[in-house]
Regions:
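Ferredoxin-type iron-sulfur electron-transfer modules and their immediate structural context
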Residues: 320, 326, 331, 377-378, ...
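Glycine/Thr-rich beta-alpha phosphate-binding loop at enzyme active sites
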Residues: 23-38, 245-345, 380-398
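Beta1-alpha1 glycine-rich phosphate/pyrophosphate-binding loop at the start
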Residues: 456-466, 503, 507-511, 537, ...
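Catalytic cores of alpha/beta
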Residues: 65-68, 355-371
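A short, basic/flexible loop-to-alpha-helix module at the beginning of a structural domain
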Residues: 39-47, 436, 521-539, 645-660, ...
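Rossmann-like dinucleotide/flavin-binding elements
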Residues: 542-563, 604-613, 627, 631-635, ...
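Glycine-rich phosphate-binding active-site loops on the catalytic face of alpha/beta enzymes
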Residues: 76-86, 245, 362-389
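N-terminal capping/small domains of soluble enzymes
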Residues: 1-234
Length: 983
């Protein structure tokens, strides 16, 4: 597959725009185009933009369709992608070149087109916007600004190629592309109501009146000044000079990023030493401002360029990449503050560097505009994020630029150091991709449900809860989840981590809504709960913890006879007996147990069960061993207290605890967090410290539990391993992190140094294991580590939950119970529920909305199980198209528009890369042969050259040899997008 893009000819581009708008009301995938209805305008370079923002020079301003899509979203200031003397195939760009999962990184730079192609693209976009702005009622024909960008040295900028580019954008009227666009427009006046040939002739060919200068790292200040002076005096262009965050100095940048959690972002001081220095910059900018004023022009700064960092983990190809997005915001906003203070607020700034929905209006209110964006548009929603921003900006008071409000700017700069949006989480994000290949057809997937071990129908119950139908919501939950009250309280909710909303604002309150439904819908649901039949199975369940309770629920609901043997006096296992009350109330456990009683489950309490063989001999048809992980982990340090034993005592007999003032917990899982928080609540305790041989980022504890412990005052000592405990002192060895182990975490290595901590009680929270002796007594086959070899031990004996996995989560125990129940019964115990309403689902994609009341949170759910389209939205070039087939969105990749940036691969929930793995349309046979993608190209005889599963053949689009869904998608693509065959 080639990474060379094929610009769309103007007639085909306009055909797509007009057809899509008439059919769907959308423009190049922007589903609800922004209409500037207020009529308000700003003044910039003698032009009158309707809004003060738009896409930055980069992936969203390279092709005509990118600029048009941005305009449709409400952008009215377009910073065109930089051109330089190296272009086209002479400019190699490593691929993939973009990684925007959290903060952004890239290894691209100037346009990948040739300079003449770039000129054509910008002229096409300018002309197209002149046509559609008024025709579609989006705004005034002169309501937008194009700002060209050039680099990187004066000699290159003075070459004939770049000079022709600059002059062509200053006056495009004599360019072949302008003339071709004008001819097309005059031949299609009927497509634009009221448009006349005279009006077309009156379109201003002055595409750009301003320019942004980009220079390479290490460019001497004298060269920067020479280029800027040339652009001002010789080219008579309003000029912005792009500055680097390195102006802040290495120490400030390093300390700031460290304080915000980016200590592992690697860079040294060489760029800081070689780049423009602040002491040289300010006098230069004073001189250039004076020169601009003498020419009747504006001089300002573009803040800022991306930030160069080292590639250390193979994130992208090469040795150095450029950081953007939320991590760049604190640096760039402080650079803006520093420079504006030096100029007493009089310096004009074009801002980029982490701008997004959350800070855009504050920048504008401070007098910092125009503002350009990149990283936020690379995330789900893409260009559809723009209308919300445009509306917010248009609601502000428009005033002429008279200077920057330094107090507002300083407040923004200070806020950037404390706002959690710009801080990296304590722990790395969980993987958001599954381990499956994306299918060619029907790939929409809800990552929340996919990440859930029991695949809860989350959007369905969220919708029902939002409608106040809590009993129905609980019914949907209980079809797959036997413990709604327990999981609604303490589930580790991987669904929340997987929620696509994480890429917008805040994840949905999935667990909270589950608990809400379990509490408000419980009594009516319980009243109606009954076995669905009468089955012959008699199942003995050994252990009444979460696994045993869940298995009993699924079996009894289906009509099986179930008996639970529980050693203690109540069901719940570790959840009831160990997990502190401040995490889950006992009445939540009681409600889940009450459902078992309603289903007729027999519960034998305070009883140790017979062996599996004996139970089978006594008439049970099946035995399930749900006896937990009873073998407690040890540090093997004399005087240690086991965390489980401590938590049991703290929960059942808190008055008997005498643990002293200084408590140390060794370990870093959720049990360690529970033990530390419980110890803090014991009278007489002065402080609690967790020691861990790695760092917080490697801790196995959920980040939520870690943050709760920190908030309550638990101290953390990283890189310490306990070695001895005596005389109220704990001696620990200092550790350092080495290479990653098989789990991906960096292995701790000894340093030979020790440290001593005050310690009255040492609590060991170092994991539990299944009880190998008990399991062996029940005939369970064990591996070399003493763990069961399989969940299904025989046709009649099963092991599940912690007894199978070791310490695991409640929802994993439920997943084991589901699978076991279905094997015992020979039927599925689950139903599939899909949210019935798709109203506004598409409109929500792009809208940022912070979490509110949990029961109203469905308004933020995007229904990813029905409509995903992440790959469509995040592609700057519109290379992934949504084709609706039988009421479902399918995705077709358009080869000629793709430059293999890799952004769609980042946000696809599958392990795949849509630009490589989805069904692909090729413009001709040469492009088809240059790729291994599944897909097709149309031949002049009306047949298609097809590739599927590695096989190539000629076929009619209705060829029965084609899979029916693929054939239908190919036909529908050509019907909905006939311009593809013409381009």
């Amino acid at each position: 597959m080639s990474d060379r893009m094929r610009p769309i000819p103007f007639p085909e581009l306009m055909e797509q725009i007009l057809t899509e708008y008439r059919r769907d009301g959308s423009v190049l995938g922007v589903r609800a185009p922004y209409r500037h209805e207020s009529g308000k305008r700003l003044e910039l370079f003698g032009e009158k933009p309707e809004t003060p923002f738009g896409p930055a020079a980069g992936p969203h301003t390279q092709l005509a369709q990118n600029l048009i899509a941005a305009y449709a979203g409400g952008a009215r200031f377009m910073e065109l992608k930089t051109v330089q003397k190296l272009d086209g195939e002479d400019l190699p760009v490593s691929k993939p070149c973009i990684l925007a999962e959290a903060e952004g990184y890239n290894v691209e730079w100037s346009t990948e087109l040739t300079v003449p192609q770039a000129l054509d693209e910008y002229v096409k976009a300018w002309f197209a916007l002149k046509l559609i702005s008024a025709a579609f009622g989006l705004g005034a024909r002169d309501g937008f600004v194009f700002n060209m960008s050039v680099g990187y040295d004066l000699a290159g900028i003075r070459t004939e190629k770049l000079d022709r580019f600059i002059e062509g954008l200053k006056d495009a009227s004599q360019t072949p592309m302008w003339q071709a666009c004008a001819a097309w427009a005059k031949a299609h006046l009927s497509d634009f109501e009221g448009l006349t040939a005279a009006e077309v002739d009156a379109f201003s060919p002055q595409v750009c009146r301003s320019i942004t200068l980009s220079t390479l790292h290490g460019c001497p200040p004298e060269e920067i000044e020479r280029i800027a002076a040339y652009l001002l005096k010789d080219k008579h262009l309003h000029t912005f000079v792009k500055c680097n965050p390195t102006l802040l100095g290495y120490t400030y940048a390093r300390e700031t990023l460290n304080s915000l959690g980016y200590a592992d972002v690697a860079f040294d001081d060489h760029h800081f030493k070689n780049d423009l220095q602040f002491a040289d910059a300010v006098p230069m900018f004073v001189r250039l401002s004076s020169l601009a004023q003498s020419q009747g022009l504006t001089f300002g700064l573009k803040l800022s360029n991306t930030f160069p960092v080292k590639i250390t983990r193979g994130e992208l190809p090469g040795e150095e990449m450029y950081m953007s997005g939320k991590a760049l915001w604190p640096l760039t906003i402080h650079l803006a503050e520093t420079l504006e203070k030096a100029f007493e607020g009089e310096l004009r700034v074009s801002y980029s560097g982490g701008a997004d929905t959350h800070n855009l209006t504050e920048l504008f209110q401070a007098g910092i505009w125009p503002v350009t964006l990149a990283t936020t548009l690379l995330k789900p929603g893409g260009y559809n994020r723009l209308p919300q921003m445009a509306r917010a900006l248009a609601a502000q008071e428009y005033r002429p630029f008279t200077g920057v409000a330094l107090d507002r700017l300083s407040a923004l700069a200070q806020k950037s150091l404390t706002d959690p949006r710009y801080r990296r989480p304590l722990k790395p994000a969980l993987p958001r991709k599954n381990d499956r290949d994306v299918p060619l057809i029907d790939c929409s997937l809800a990552p929340c449900s996919d990440a859930c071990p029991i695949h809860q129908d989350i959007s369905a119950y969220m919708e029902l809860a939002a409608q106040g139908r809590y009993t129905e919501a609980l019914g949907v939950i209980c079809d797959k989840n036997a413990l709604p009250n327990i999981t609604g309280s303490i589930c580790n909710h991987r669904c929340t981590a997987a929620c696509v909303r994480n890429q917008y604002d805040d994840p949905l309150s999935i667990r909270q809504v589950k608990l809400l439904a379990a509490e408000r819908g419980f009594r009516p649901y319980l009243d109606a709960l009954a076995p669905v039949g009468d089955r012959p199975e008699r199942v003995a369940i050994v252990g009444g913890g979460p696994a045993g309770m869940a298995l009993a629920f699924f079996l009894a609901r289906a009509g099986a006879k179930v008996t639970i043997f529980e050693e203690k006096n109540a069901l719940g296992g570790v959840v009831r007996n160990v997990i502190p009350e401040f995490r889950i109330a006992c009445d939540a456990i009681d409600r889940d147990a009450e459902m078992l009683a309603k289903l007729g489950v027999q519960i034998v309490r305070n009883t140790r069960a017979e062996t599996a063989q004996t139970l089978l001999e006594n008439g049970f048809t099946h035995v399930a061993l749900c006896c937990g992980a009873q073998s407690r982990g040890k540090l093997n340090i004399p005087g240690e207290t086991n965390a489980i034993a401590f938590l049991e005592q703290a929960k059942r007999y808190p008055d008997t605890l005498e643990i002293g003032a200084h408590i140390v917990v060794a370990g870093a899982g959720n049990t360690a967090m529970d033990a530390a928080r419980a110890a803090l609540r014991v009278p007489g305790v002065a402080d609690v410290t967790i020691v861990y041989r790695r760092t917080k980022r490697e801790m196995p504890a959920e980040e939520e539990e870690l943050n709760l412990a920190l908030a309550e005052g638990v101290r953390f000592e990283e890189l310490l391993a306990p070695v001895s405990f005596a005389d109220a002192k704990l001696t620990c060895e200092k550790m350092k992190l080495g290479a990653p182990d098989e789990s991906g975490r960096r292995s701790p290595e000894t340093t030979g140094e020790t440290v001593t901590l005050p310690c009255d009680t040492l609590i060991a929270a170092v994991g539990e294991k299944p009880d190998a002796v008990t399991l062996a007594e029940n005939g369970v086959k064990l591996d070399a580590k003493g763990r069961p070899t399989a969940r299904k031990q025989s046709e009649r004996v099963y092991v599940l939950g912690d007894a199978l996995r070791g310490p695991a989560t409640v929802v994993e125990a439920i997943a084991d119970a589901q699978a076991t129940a279905e094997e015992i019964l020979g039927i599925s115990t689950r139903k599939c529920h899909c949210a019935t309403s798709d109203t506004e689902l598409l409109a929500r994609r792009g809208i940022e909305a912070e979490a509110g009341a949990p029961d109203a949170d469905f308004a933020r759910c995007m229904g990813c199980d029905k409509v995903c389209l992440n790959c469509v939205d995040v592609c700057p070039n519109r290379a992934n198209e949504a084709v609706w087939l039988n009421g479902k969105p399918q995705v077709v990749h358009i080869d000629g528009r793709c430059n293999e940036c890799g952004n769609c691969a980042t946000f696809c929930p599958y392990q795949s890369a849509p630009y490589l793995d989805k069904l692909t349309f090729f413009v001709d046979e040469a492009a088809f042969r240059d790729s291994g993608n599944p897909g097709w190209t149309m031949r002049k005889d009306g047949n298609a050259l097809v590739r599927l599963d590695g096989r190539e053949w000629l076929a009619a689009l209705n060829d029965p040899a084609l899979p029916a869904e693929v054939s239908a998608l190919m036909r529908e693509t050509m019907r909905q997008m006939p311009w593809l065959a013409k381009a």
